[in-house]
Amino acid sequence: MQLNKFLDVKPEVAEAIAAGKPVVALESTIISHGMPYPQNVQTALEVERIIRENGAVPATIAIIGGRLKAGLTEEEIEYFGKKGTAIAKASRRDLAVLCARGEDGATTVTTTMIIAHMAGIKVFATGGIGGVHRGAETTMDISADLEELASTPVMVVCAGAKSILDLGLTLEYLETHGVPVIGYGTRELPAFYTRKSGFAVDYEIDTPAELAKAFYVKQDMGLGGGMLVTNPIPEEYSMDADVINKAIDEAVEEAKAQGIHGKETTPFLLAKIKDLTGGDSLASNIQLVYNNAKLAAATAVELSKLAKN
């Protein structure tokens, strides 16, 4: 397959990959659907700055004019931020049609993993992954992110699954598909806005070097698939569990009442939760992304050292 037929790798990113330097992939749904302009652009550029500050090259991933992009320019990030929700969220099923039509697409965890892997990027920082939605035993609403983690060899650094989901069933699904769930400095799965969920992770790992080694060995053994690193939100930005859980329950009920389902569910719930918490949930969301970018960069640095030895 000729990847350059579909894929544009930003020169700085291509040079870093060719030289075995650390690179961290970033998604673009957080820009288009995560928050309003200009806050979305400022946040995206700040995440890139944090990755550089911690020794890696950032590669924000998106689809622009039917081209898969691994690494965006500031102008492209600005374009994405201004268009916002007018850009379609793109999952695995959407890639071929968007490329065939020459359209734009905002990459989710799934599509960011796919394009990162095509480009040769091993580490990806995001806010939280999708998972098994509440009530999925009747709706079958399960995020494609989980299937991608099972099949695509990229390490995903996140703050746990979004707490709007059924976390127990999400962990069961990942276990069935052989995806290791690692807690960074914790034995408990973080729940995005809060540091605790009541569910155990598979392993606790306490350093970026050990994270890198575990992922390197997994690849070396030919096991395939990704690895999920869950990094708790910093204590000072963690939300009160009662407050956030009440907001989540209200938002879930409202989504049901309005008949919202499928890929519209998560943006609706996050926007509703933001309203119900007076914007506190968005502030927490931004800080946990910064925190994950820092850990992903440090881990990518260690991974590049292992690859060179």
Q: What would you call each of these model-derived segments?
A:
Residues 28, 33-35, 41-98, 220-236, ...:
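Glycine-rich nucleotide/cofactor/substrate-binding loop typically near the N-terminus or early
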Residues 15-18, 23-24, 53, 115-118, ...:
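Solvent-exposed alpha-helices and their adjacent loops that cap or buttress functional pockets
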Residues 72-153:
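Divalent-metal (Mg2+/Mn2+/Ca2+)-assisted nucleotide/phosphate chemistry catalytic cores
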Residues 1-20:
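N- or domain-start disorder-to-order transition segments that initiate the globular core
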Residues 223-291:
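A C-terminal functional module that forms or caps the active site or interfaces directly
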Residues 195-220:
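Anionic-ligand binding region
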Residues 108-109, 137-150, 154-175, 209-213:
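Active-site glycine-rich loop that binds ribose-phosphate moieties when present
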Residues 24-26, 58-63, 105, 123-128, ...:
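General beta-strand structural signal in soluble alpha/beta enzymes
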